[in-house]
């Protein structure tokens, strides 16, 4: 991909990118929701650079697909393709605080040491049963179905636990044919199941009171502030595109709630 993108809603295709089928599925599943472009500055719609050595340079492509709907403040896909160095899809749905909905989060990362893959419907108010109970009752059977097919990803840091549900599906799998098979046979259908449930919740969601909306906003801000501060992609993006671009991307696109309003 070298042609400049004109809109965040413009179809996004990156050559040889492992996660293209996942993004294509998500974009297709969202189509019935009357999508509108989400404002993203041109330098974040598509950015290219090189990594590797002078003798063996590797092309890096970082691109953003994004939209919004009446119930979803921001839907965005951060996409990175850098050959053997990295292949990433970070797909997040940020709901409007006018609706009592969790976040949808998918982090699909391929690095030289293996694949790190995570799916969740992340709560804005984890200790609030009104926010979580009905979601978790429907999420846990899906989680249990796919958890038994995948190796565990390891412990969650204590400080991160408020931002993940009991249905957090987190796995580390090896590169090569074994990992490829697990991605095709377990990770891909799990991604579809998690997204399907999320879109069902969006369809069913009804507008909440201004008081409830304020509570949800406070919870969302805690989540996005934490994610912006602890974003594990910061080092990789800085290496590829520099610190100034990376900080602007993290705070102005990926986790922009403090800069935007409904």
Curated annotation (Swiss-Prot):
Among Gene3D superfamilies, the record links this protein to: 3.40.1500.20
List the molecular function annotations (GO) for this entry.
Answer: cobalt ion binding; phycoerythrobilin:ferredoxin oxidoreductase activity
Q: Cite the entry's keywords alphabetically.
A: Oxidoreductase
Q: Name one GO biological process term.
A: phytochromobilin biosynthetic process
Family annotation (InterPro entries): Ferredoxin-dep_bilin_Rdtase (IPR009249), Phycoerythrobilin_Fdx_Rdtase (IPR022827)
Q: Which reaction does it catalyse?
A: (3Z)-phycoerythrobilin + oxidized 2[4Fe-4S]-[ferredoxin] = 15,16-dihydrobiliverdin + reduced 2[4Fe-4S]-[ferredoxin] + 2 H(+)
Q: What superkingdom does the record give?
A: Bacteria
The EC category is: oxidoreductase
Q: Name one Pfam family in it.
A: Fe_bilin_red
E.C. code: 1.3.7.3
- Residues annotated as coiled-coil are none
Q: Which family does it belong to?
A: Belongs to the HY2 family.
Explain the purpose of this protein: Catalyzes the two-electron reduction of the C2 and C3(1) diene system of 15,16-dihydrobiliverdin.
What name does UniProt use for this protein? Phycoerythrobilin:ferredoxin oxidoreductase
């Amino acid at each position: 991909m070298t042609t400049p993108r004109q809109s965040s809603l413009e179809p996004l295709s990156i050559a040889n990118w492992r996660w293209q089928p996942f993004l294509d599925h998500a974009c297709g599943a969202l189509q019935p929701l009357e999508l509108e472009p989400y404002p993203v500055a041109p330098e974040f719609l598509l950015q290219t650079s090189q990594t590797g050595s002078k003798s063996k340079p590797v092309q890096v492509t970082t691109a953003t697909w994004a939209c919004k709907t009446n119930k979803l403040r921001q839907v965005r896909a951060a996409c990175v393709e850098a050959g053997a160095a990295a292949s990433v899809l970070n797909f997040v749905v940020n709901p409007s605080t006018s609706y009592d909905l969790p976040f949808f989060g998918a982090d699909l990362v391929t690095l030289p040491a293996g694949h790190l893959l995570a799916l969740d419907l992340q709560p804005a108010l984890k200790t609030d049963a009104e926010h979580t109970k009905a979601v978790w009752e429907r999420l846990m059977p899906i989680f249990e179905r796919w958890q038994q097919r995948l190796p565990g990803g390891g412990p969650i840091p204590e400080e991160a636990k408020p931002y993940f549900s009991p249905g957090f599906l987190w796995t580390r799998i090896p590169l090569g044919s074994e990992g490829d098979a697990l991605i095709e046979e377990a990770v891909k259908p799990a991604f579809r199941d998690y997204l399907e449930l999320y879109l069902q919740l969006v369809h069913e969601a009804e507008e909440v009171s201004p008081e409830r909306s304020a509570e949800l906003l406070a919870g969302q801000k805690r989540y996005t502030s934490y994610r912006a501060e602890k974003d594990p992609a910061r080092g990789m993006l800085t290496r590829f595109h520099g610190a100034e671009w990376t900080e602007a991307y993290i705070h102005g696109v990926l986790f922009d709630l403090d800069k935007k309003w409904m």
